[in-house]
């Protein structure tokens, strides 16, 4: 099905295999930011369409909590799905069915561990 599952992202227009900085797999937020802010009028066959988005049918990422956008559910921009809903902070843990896009969420993680501050320290 040519989907990619990666923690954060990648910056190489040739894909993660050609990534110059391997730390981008864990830290890159440009893929998410680009997908969310893309001009919807740019068609996939346009020379302006980002090449790295054409490499996969869908790309599933985390690392950038949707809470940064005041959203508590998975977000989609182009073919990029961000399913990090902030469980490391005060959000919920989320899983998604990649075929149907149905998703399930826990209660806020801190309700299970009230004494644990997580990344909210």
Which residue stretches match the model-derived regions?
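Acidic, His/Gly-enriched loop-helix segments that form or flank divalent-metal centers
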Residues: 1-81, 86-91, 98, 102-109, ...
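Nucleic-acid-processing active sites and adjacent nucleic-acid-binding tracks
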Residues: 113-121
């Amino acid at each position: 099905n040519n989907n990619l599952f990666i923690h954060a992202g990648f910056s190489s227009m040739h894909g993660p295999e050609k990534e110059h900085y391997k730390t981008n797999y864990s830290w890159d937020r440009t893929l998410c930011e680009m997908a969310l802010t893309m001009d919807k009028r740019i068609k996939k066959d346009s020379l302006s369409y980002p090449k790295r988005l054409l490499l996969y049918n869908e790309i599933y990422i985390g690392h950038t909590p949707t809470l940064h956008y005041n959203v508590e559910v998975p977000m989609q921009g182009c073919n990029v799905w961000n399913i990090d809903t902030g469980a490391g902070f005060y959000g919920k843990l989320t899983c998604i069915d990649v075929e149907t896009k149905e998703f399930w969420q826990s209660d806020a993680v801190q309700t299970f561990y009230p004494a644990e501050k997580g990344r909210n320290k």
